[in-house]
Regions:
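A beta-strand edge to alpha-helix "cap/lid" segment located at domain peripheries
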Residues: 1-22, 27-109
Length: 109
């Protein structure tokens, strides 16, 4: 399960519209590193139709905690090419054998 959730996190970092539509739950809520908050609708509105990020940040210290049979918390750090570092926390919910992200928070450090 660790590898599956890791792969889903990486997919979202590429910021494709298709992945956001599929992997973000309708009730998705994010608190960004800036302190701004985002919903699935806001995220989709900010994406260009064919946006793809090619320089993905490094992911360090990735681990998951099973909170229930259908909810997983992923914790990890990211290091971007600029050197910017963030602690990350994601909550994933499994519905009908499909994982969807319903909460994410990033904190710069």
């Amino acid at each position: 399960m660790n590898e599956e959730i890791f792969a889903l996190e990486r997919r979202l970092m590429k910021r494709t519209r298709q992945d956001f539509e599929q992997l973000l739950a309708d009730d998705f809520y994010e608190i960004g590193t800036s302190g701004k908050t985002y919903t699935k609708g806001i995220e989709l509105d900010t994406l260009l139709e064919n946006t793809v990020v090619t320089e993905l940040p490094d992911i360090l210290n990735f681990r998951i905690h099973e909170l229930s049979a259908t909810v997983i918390q992923a914790l990890y750090d990211t290091v971007e090419f600029s050197g910017r570092r963030s602690h990350r926390s994601s909550l994933w919910r499994k519905t009908n054998d499909t994982w969807q992200l319903f909460f994410h928070q990033g904190t710069s450090f």
